[in-house]
Amino acid sequence: MKRFLLATCLVAALLWEAGAAPAHQVPVKTKGKHVFPEQETEKVWDTRALEPLEKDNQLGPLLPEPKQKPAAAEEKRPDAMTWVETEDILSHLRSPLQGPELDLDSIDHPMSDDVQDEEVPQSRPILYRQVLQGPEEDLDHLAHSMEDS
């Protein structure tokens, strides 16, 4: 049953994408004409797509403003393509830092030679090998009281 339902859904989806199964259209009566809402919407969008965007300046705040080259440069080469430069707002992140890096070695390493000559005490204690003979002593009583048993 599940396979049949899955196959039916897949066939319906494929027919829908291919356009074999048209969508149900209900006529809307307006002023004596039968108009289908989908067709009316397409006409409206087609006419709005042809209108220039500068009229309302809807995308103005979203797009960066291009920097125009001087008119003298365009007059020299009228047949050449004109390049429009835009401001790179991420340039400070891509460019390396100016000047040398800060020397922070003195934090971990002393600067003077006198300090290097002295022996620095080892921070790790020297571990001695202990050879066990026989079974290990039971030390559980140190962590657990006798009342727990």
UniProtKB/Swiss-Prot annotation:
Lipid-binding protein which promotes lipid absorption by facilitating MTTP-mediated lipid transfer (mainly triglycerides and phospholipids) and MTTP-mediated apoB lipoprotein assembly and secretion. Protects the gastrointestinal epithelium from irradiation-induced apoptosis. May play an important role in maintaining normal growth homeostasis in epithelial cells. Involved in p53/TP53-dependent cell survival after DNA damage. Disulfide bonds: none annotated. Keywords: Endoplasmic reticulum, Lipid-binding, Secreted, Signal. Residues 51-79, 97-122 are annotated as: Disordered. Disruption phenotype: Mice show an increase in the length of the small intestine. Gain significantly less body weight and fat mass when on high-fat diets compared with littermate controls and are prevented from hepatosteatosis. Show increased cytokine expression and altered gut microbiota, and are significantly more susceptible to oxidative insult by ionizing radiation, showing accelerated mortality and enterocyte apoptosis. One of its GO terms (biological process) is DNA damage response. It is found in: Secreted; Endoplasmic reticulum. The keyword Flavoprotein does not apply. GO terms for cellular component: endoplasmic reticulum; extracellular region. It comes from the Eukaryota. Residues 1-20 form the signal peptide. Residues 66-79 have a biased composition (Basic and acidic residues). InterPro entries: PRAP (IPR027922). It holds the Pfam family PRAP. Changing residue 85 to V: Impairs its ability to form a complex with triglycerides and MTTP, as well as its ability to facilitate MTTP-mediated lipid transfer and MTTP-mediated apoB lipoprotein assembly and secretion. Predominantly expressed in the intestinal epithelial cells than in the liver (at protein level). Abundantly expressed in the uterus during late pregnancy by uterus epithelial cells. After birth expression rapidly decreases and is no longer found in the uterus by the third day. Also highly expressed in the small intestine where it shows a proximal-distal graded expression. Interacts with MTTP. Interacts with MAD1L1. This is Proline-rich acidic protein 1. GO terms for molecular function: triglyceride binding.
